[in-house]
UniProtKB/Swiss-Prot annotation:
Species annotation: Dehalococcoides mccartyi (strain ATCC BAA-2266 / KCTC 15142 / 195) (Dehalococcoides ethenogenes (strain 195))
Catalytic reaction equation(s): L-threonylcarbamoyladenylate + adenosine(37) in tRNA = N(6)-L-threonylcarbamoyladenosine(37) in tRNA + AMP + H(+)
Enzyme class: transferase
Cofactor: Fe(2+)
Binding residues for substrate: 134-138, 167, 180, 184, 268
One example GO MF annotation: N(6)-L-threonylcarbamoyladenine synthase activity
Record-stated family: Belongs to the KAE1 / TsaD family.
Cofactor binding comment, as recorded: Binds 1 Fe(2+) ion per subunit.
Cross-referenced Pfam families: TsaD
Ligand binding (Fe cation): 111, 115, 293
Record's protein name: tRNA N6-adenosine threonylcarbamoyltransferase
Domain of life: Bacteria
Function: Required for the formation of a threonylcarbamoyl group on adenosine at position 37 (t(6)A37) in tRNAs that read codons beginning with adenine. Is involved in the transfer of the threonylcarbamoyl moiety of threonylcarbamoyl-AMP (TC-AMP) to the N6 group of A37, together with TsaE and TsaB. TsaD likely plays a direct catalytic role in this reaction.
Gene giving rise to this polypeptide: tsaD
Length: 326
């Protein structure tokens, strides 16, 4: 069964064809990073206009790469939230138009669930129950999965998401956008020598990174940062220490079989290394190309929802504020 996935929640226009939820036949992404980097962040209006220009060519390219026509597509899976409203609308309207014109079933996919399903495209099928650490620019969640479509939120950020914290730290240190990769690169040439705080929030699986960001800002303002690379390494280590420690504690408490890593921040080298080395449980870590926004993960998630009877009407709407558990 072939699923066409469409993703346009932020600043990537993406389309993919995935067979049976696990085999990627194509995965095309048109990135807007170069456009938004001059502004130091994503400009919603600019993102929407670029999606309009890119969406149909990207879908066409995905079908060509997969050597597939619409007559072989069993369903169209499209991200309907969370994300930027104007960006989401472009992908959803394209999916609706194709579904209506071709008589193909439509499946709405939660972008956060899509990130998790990168682990079904990584060569080994995860075991339930599993704990997923989803870390991105807008979300930092610990989610228990007992089966397909079964999500229980165990922990979340109370302020800044991990990816947002990296972006802000990069701006404080004068590094480039996007901040996560910039911090990661700078850290390769630095040492984690700065004493930065870690917010543990005893008795909770929640996260908090705003205090860490403020502490870094104060050090910079007071002239106590001599090396940008050391500061980046210190900030990254503080974030990763909290992410890994709280994930392992949560996994032990809920007696899961496996830990899954997902989201854009899952591309961080230290996080991937530290979680793998410190976990007593098997850890599934997707290839870096599947951590950032793409449509293959949307198609995979959509497949499992579709075979379980999930299908949406053509009046389905975008949900910009959708959470991992709705």
């Amino acid at each position: 069964m072939k699923i066409l996935g469409i993703e346009s929640s932020c600043d990537e226009t993406a389309a993919a064809v995935v067979a049976d939820g696990v085999n990627i036949l194509s995965n095309r992404v048109s990135s807007q990073i170069d456009i938004h980097s001059r502004y130091g962040g994503v400009v919603p209006e600019v993102a929407s206009r670029q999606h309009l220009l890119s969406i149909l060519p990207v879908i066409s390219d995905a079908l060509k790469e997969a050597r597939t026509g619409f007559d072989e597509i069993s369903a169209i899976a499209v991200t309907n939230g969370p994300g930027l409203a104007g960006s989401l609308i472009v992908g959803v309207n394209a999916a609706k138009a194709i579904a209506a014109a071709r008589g193909i079933p439509l499946v709405a996919v939660n972008h956060l669930h899509g990130h998790i399903y990168a682990n079904w495209l990584s060569g080994r099928i995860p075991e339930f129950p599993c704990l997923c650490l989803t870390v991105s620019g807008g979300h930092t969640d610990l989610v228990l999965m007992k089966g397909h479509g079964q999500y229980q939120l165990l922990g979340r950020t109370r302020d800044d998401a991990a990816g947002e914290a990296f972006d802000k730290a990069a701006r404080i240190l004068g590094l480039s956008y996007p901040g996560g990769p910039a911090i990661d690169r700078a850290s390769q040439d630095g040492e984690a020598v700065l004493d930065l705080p870690r917010s543990w929030i005893p008795g909770s699986h929640d996260f908090s990174f705003s205090g860490l960001k403020t502490a870094l800002l104060r050090l910079v303002e007071n002239g106590e940062v001599c090396s940008v690379n050391d500061a980046a390494a210190s900030f990254q280590k503080a974030v990763v220490d909290v992410l890994v420690t709280k994930t392992l504690n949560c996994a032990h408490e809920y007696n899961v079989k496996q830990i899954l890593l997902a989201g854009g921040v899952a591309a961080n080298n230290l996080l991937r290394k530290q979680l793998s080395e410190q976990s007593p449980l098997p850890v599934s870590i997707p290839p870096i190309g599947l951590c950032t926004d793409n449509a293959a993960v949307i198609a995979s998630c959509g497949y499992f929802r579709f075979i379980s009877g999930g299908q949406d009407r053509l009046d389905m709407d975008v949900l910009p504020a959708l959470s991992v558990v709705s």
